[in-house]
């Protein structure tokens, strides 16, 4: 589209070198004048290489990193003071902890003594009940045994005696009655025979008495009278009655055994009551540890060495950042200088486009002023065959890489790079925190070790007192139990011996001695033997053993709080109840690192937002281009496409009119900028209006009178129809 404007005084785009040539002829404008120029030459440009954006950004990053390092050093200095203060607090707390046995032992000693006294009191009651129960059980058992077997013995012996007496009486009665009857019959027969014989003798005596003398008479009646009085001796009945009357009643055994058994038990109960009724544990035998004072902060290089190492890291990092960034800022001048040389050469080459009428002068100015972004746009546009789309692609790239947009992008990248440098420094510091944690852990270990030593010493002394109590009770109480069990065993032996003696005295010379002894061994002897074995077991196991105090009575909780198995870091005795770290000292360092990390995070977010602004700006250009990319191009009849700019010859003042054309020449791909189709026919241009006076400045030129040309310039935008982009 052509714009008609009245003539006005303007500063020409291309200064008319030699416009006041005294010869009045038209001169060729030099592309690289050797004299003084109003624009910067190559040497002038190279003299400002160190002011390039990358060097400035790197120096800004360096300044931000140095500020961060200084802030970290200041924060670490404060953290060191707080850590030393916390160490002093931990030292005081550790001293209080290792002195806790001094205070706790008094209560624990009282608890231990009271526990022993209550145990002894319960032991006394239990012993008395046990002794009484065992006493009665043994007596009951023995009485049941010998009274049961007494009944058995009585039944057997008395039954046998009664049977024998009956048999003897029957035999005596039978013998007495039978012998007398036989004696009487014999007596009668003998008397008859004797009478006859005596008569016969009398007759003989009468005849032969003169010759032989007198024959004696037969007299056996006296002998027969003895037969009449024949009977069994009465001693048989008396012997059997003696056996019957001599069966033992075990009254003596009962009385003897009862007295013997009750004597040791009653003696034991008397001794137990006398010894344990007023038993009091000797509390003075339990020790009370002395107070302790720890001092591991003074003269300890743990905290100082940690913060010295952190200071060394920050100093080293600062030196490295200064060296690297300054070297990078200096080295970046080399490619920037080389870039300026190439840009200068490219500008000289492309400045010739101003003399050609096939190029849009604004495009030429853009290509010359922004060679790299313009070249990128040209390369990206070469993928499209449509000139409209080629121009849109170049426009998008130009929109996204405009100086304001590039400033925003570079600012965002510089901020992100600064955050990266600070993050590297932060991680270098955080890697040293475990060393401080280890050192603080050693502090806790020192406290626990001291506490364990105190606890172990106290436990050893207390256990010694408890062991003495065990020995005393075992000697004075269970010694009596051992004595009583031995006495009971002796009593049972006496019982067995006495019972066996009674049985031997009773049945020793009778046929019942063997069976009675066997019955006794089977029914009583085996039971007594079992009881003796039980009493022997009681004798071997009757002793008291109070549990001893562990060596870590006062240190177990502290040791568990710093052990690896502790799942909650706030359980550490070096931490407060609401702390999330294992101790106060490392919490100070973590607070500093968290603060720095929060600052880095904030700066990262700000840089990301700035980068997002550039992305949004680029997306706006992309969306605008896409809206035109797919829309149909309007024809001239629809209001699109202005008339071609006519070629204007140079005027008498030496200005060169560059015609504006809008249609590219797709056949020209070797040019640094797209060519447009052939020039339109020349149009007569009125130059009646003179140029206004304009002072050129310090170049020493005179004021130029330039005639305004109404059709010299059109719109400064790339035009498609009536649209401007």
From Swiss-Prot:
It is a multi-pass membrane protein. GO terms for cellular component: mating projection tip; plasma membrane. Its main location: membrane. Residues 1-53, 158-318, 418-602 are extracellular. The chain crosses the membrane at residues 54-74, 137-157, 319-339, 395-417, 603-623. It is found in: Cell membrane. InterPro entries: PRM1. GO terms for biological process: plasma membrane fusion involved in cytogamy. Residues 75-136, 340-394, 624-725 are cytoplasmic. Glycans are attached at residues 176, 244, 273, 278, 482, 489, 504, 551. Keywords: Cell membrane, Conjugation, Glycoprotein, Membrane, Transmembrane, Transmembrane helix. Belongs to the PRM1 family. Involved in cell fusion during mating by stabilizing the plasma membrane fusion event. This is Plasma membrane fusion protein prm1. The gene is prm1.
